[in-house]
Amino acid sequence: MSQTEPLDQDPVFQLKGSMLAITVLELARNDLDALDRQLAAKVALAPNFFNNAPLVLALDKLPAGQGVIDLPGLMRVCRSHGLRTLAIRASRIEDIAAAIAIELPVLPPSGARERPLEPLVGEEKKKPEKPPEPTIKPTKIITSPVRGGQQIYAQGGDLVVISSVSPGAELLADGNIHVYGPMRGRALAGIKGDTKARIFCQQLTAELVSIAGQYKVSEDLRRDPLWGASVQVNLSGDVLNIIRL
């Protein structure tokens, strides 16, 4: 081995978790011609919004009896309008097999709630000289337990929960999140990119904690010596720090 050859012990890469914004195209029926026309109309509203946008093709909501999807043809239609397919979401065997045949990643069917994505018409033409002053909104305070399946969002401010948060519950805030009870669900602070946001938990047993898109899941959190303790979570660079309160 030459002296210039790197040692095996020296890492050449690092795997990091990050929550990325990816458009999901949920196909309602198997009609590529109609899709081509409707996509053209949508893209015409804001071309740069869709240009080279990463895309997941969701085929798992297609009604029964729609027939076999021409997956390469579907991808060509999307690509012609600037959308780059990263993966498909599917449950039918034929769709999964078609994706595997062209080495396209397959995601499991989603149970999460997704909202329609609508570009702002004329957003490229109107560029304000300076960003508007942020609107300060009061802290959102929840006094009752947050049950599994519930989602609570504090838009423009902090979220305070003076009770427990069950597994499957989701807390979101543009600012900080405070939980004065067992935290067993998901807590996502600074969801619009505020890297100074923090999460405060009286008892950290969460499924996921996230600040400004950087996150740790329960498998990572359980290995932390402060699992189950009273902690705060902050972000330093792209690293989440867990500190005892």
Curated annotation (Swiss-Prot):
Keyword Magnesium: no
Keywords of the record: Cell cycle, Cell division, Septation
Pfam families: MinC_C, MinC_N
Keyword Coiled coil in record: no
Ranges of compositional bias, category Basic and acidic residues: 113-132
Region (Disordered): 113-138
InterPro entries in UniProt: CAP/MinC_C (IPR016098), MinC (IPR013033), MinC_C_sf (IPR036145), MinC_N (IPR007874), Septum_form_inhib_MinC_C (IPR005526)
Gene Ontology BP terms: cell morphogenesis; division septum assembly; regulation of cell division; regulation of cell septum assembly
Coiled coil: none
NCBIfam families: minC
HAMAP family: MinC
Quaternary structure, from the entry: Interacts with MinD and FtsZ.
Function: Cell division inhibitor that blocks the formation of polar Z ring septums. Rapidly oscillates between the poles of the cell to destabilize FtsZ filaments that have formed before they mature into polar Z rings. Prevents FtsZ polymerization.
Similarity comment: Belongs to the MinC family.
UniProt protein name: Probable septum site-determining protein MinC
Record organism: Pseudomonas fluorescens (strain SBW25)
